[in-house]
A protein has these predicted regions:
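Bacterial N-terminal signal peptides that target proteins for export
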Residues: 1-12
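Carbohydrate-interacting regions of secretory-pathway proteins
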Residues: 20-272
């Protein structure tokens, strides 16, 4: 909608007419005429302002088939092999791959990406075992670790009672999800995660990490400021922040449960 606002414009001389007129109009109508941005100072609706790049959006997954990543994403797993992954020590990842997914192999250890990431958008899909034999934290347990450090819990939380900060979509030991959006055991589920890394100055954290998480399309972590680490120390203790590199690998956890993963991709984000 375009709305016309009538206001007087003081003429200050030809050389500064535009700037002065803009200043008076801003003051008169209590509005904004110029915007200070990362790419410079721009007039509102300025056609010379840089346009965003054009990409091809991805496609949605179904229970039977994984979707496709957007064209500007870094694909970490497309269902064919583990060429983008290693063990924690850097050896070949030993999880199995079949029918378009990877599956945790008990006692083979966590796996990590060969590439390192900081702030990012992450899409990942998972399925806990369809056959339920355990309860609480022993039921479909795994984890998605941003920067190999900050965990979004993976767990079968469908009709499965456990401590709230350890259920599915929790920031482990730190933040309880807004709702329990779990599907039934064996069904494919998704996380869409917006993560901004912590920033350190020496041994001090000067900006804490933030998480926004959608679980099966439902907002469950709303720009949560992570108050510290998520590594388990004992029953009632998790770690504090510890300085680390600006970029680190993504890690998936082997918690002795045959959890499956598919359609994993990431888009790197600029630090603000």
């Amino acid at each position: 909608m375009i709305r016309t606002v009538s206001s007087g414009i003081f003429v200050c001389g030809l050389s500064i007419l535009a700037g002065c007129a803009g200043m008076q109009e801003t003051n008169k109508i209590n509005g904004t005429r110029y915007l200070e941005t990362e790419t410079g100072r721009w007039l509102v609706h300025d056609m010379n302002r840089p346009a965003p790049p054009v990409i091809t959006p991805g496609t949605q997954s179904t229970q039977k088939q994984a979707g496709k990543a957007p064209s500007d994403a870094i694909v970490l797993f497309d269902g064919t092999d583990l060429s983008e992954w290693t063990t924690i020590k850097g050896g070949p990842a030993k999880w199995t791959v079949r029918d378009g997914y990877m599956r945790v192999v008990k006692k083979t250890g966590d796996i990590k990406t060969k590439q390192s990431f900081g702030s990012c958008q992450l899409h990942i899909e998972f399925a806990t075992p369809s056959r339920v034999t355990r309860k609480s934290q022993e039921r479909g347990n795994s984890g998605v670790f941003l920067m190999s450090t900050y965990e979004v819990q993976v767990l079968d939380s469908y009709e499965n009672q456990t401590y709230p900060d350890g259920q599915c979509a929790a920031l482990y030991g730190r933040a309880v999800p807004l709702v329990n959006a779990c599907r039934k055991p064996g069904q494919w589920q998704s996380y869409d995660i917006i993560f901004h890394r912590p920033i350190f100055k020496g041994n001090k954290v000067v900006r804490k990490a933030t998480f926004t998480v959608f679980h099966n399309g439902v907002l469950v972590q709303d720009h949560v400021v992570l108050q510290g680490g998520t590594d388990w120390i004992d029953e009632h203790t998790v770690t504090n922040y510890s300085p680390h590199e600006d970029k680190l690998p993504l890690m998936l956890q082997d918690h002795d449960n045959p959890v499956r993963y598919r359609n994993i991709w990431v888009r790197e984000l600029k630090d603000k």
